[in-house]
Amino acid sequence: VVRLRARVTPVGTKGGPALSARLSKSEYKANEPIQIELESPTRTYVGIYAWGADNMVVRLYPNEATSLVVIEPGKSRLLPRPYEAQIASMPMPIEGNMEDHEAIIVVASPMPIKFASLAGAAGKSLAQTMSIALPGTKFFSALAANDPSRLTIRVLPYRVHQ
């Protein structure tokens, strides 16, 4: 006999920010820069994560250069900024693999939360990033430990190809 117990809480039901998030496009060539546009009618704190085709997650923001991402009311924010490291992706390095489907996950809150506790920051190289990445199940478990009713979560899928 298997018994399951769960606490089910709808996301954003107690004041999750009305965040608008979108990628510059839905399809990218390998290593082509990815841009994320964010906008909210209220002051919003944001964490941004990359969810790879291998089901591994790393944190893009906040990071060493940008300790806090805040969207001011009614103002649009484009990331990364010109002076920040670019966000890029490529298909998994498996022989014959020409494309993958991945996603950027945006977690928004009306107040600061410990975004760094959800996943480690992307590294300075692919090898370093892969060693830091954690399985999607661990990321989502850590995310659920926060009050999901006060969060807004946007999943921005894209296709990356050679």
Can you say where each PLM-predicted feature lies in the sequence?
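Secretory-pathway glycoprotein ectodomains that are cysteine- and/or Ser/Thr/Pro-rich
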Residues: 1-162
